[in-house]
Regions:
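Small cysteine-rich, disulfide-bonded extracellular modules of the LU/uPAR three-finger superfamily
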Residues: 1-95, 102-144
Length: 144
């Protein structure tokens, strides 16, 4: 299935206002079985209000922390990368993944960065559910 990735408009504003620091804040990813995106989603409370978080063996509500997070710049392009998030020994069905800044500590203060539409429901059954990060990064920002 083809995955499509979308950056939340509010994320760009939050970065510009220094409300999130992608190189030092705690970043996480959560899975959803259903979700309807809106440009107005500014917090994880908004995101959860428009979707159904996945559940199942091996999955904890709120998702998991991203590991090996790096923010690097080459020329005019800044890239956020991380290791592939994986839930081992899990039984999960998900159609969306939401990556977010968890520095706020609560759904009302945690800030969404981007979401993936997995192109349909992906599942694991007593196996590993993995999100494969594109070789060019999770998110890229290009200066003119």
């Amino acid at each position: 299935m083809a995955v499509s990735s979308h950056v939340y408009p509010k994320a760009q504003e939050n970065i510009a206002k220094k409300a999130m620091n992608l190189s030092t804040d705690s970043l996480k990813v959560m899975l959803f079985s259903a979700y309807t995106f809106a440009n107005t989603h500014a917090t994880i409370t908004d995101v959860k209000g428009a979707g159904t978080e996945a559940s199942g063996t091996g999955y904890t509500a709120g998702g998991q922390a991203l590991t090996s997070v790096t923010l690097s710049t080459s020329g005019t392009v800044t890239t956020l990368t991380c290791a592939n998030p994986a839930w081992s020994s899990s039984t999960i069905s998900a159609a969306y993944a939401v990556f977010y800044d968890a520095q706020g500590g609560t759904d009302a203060t945690n800030l969404p960065i981007c979401y993936w539409d997995l192109g349909g429901t992906s599942s694991s059954s007593a196996g590993t559910f993995t999100l494969t990060i594109n070789g060019s990064g999770l998110v890229t920002f290009t200066a003119a």
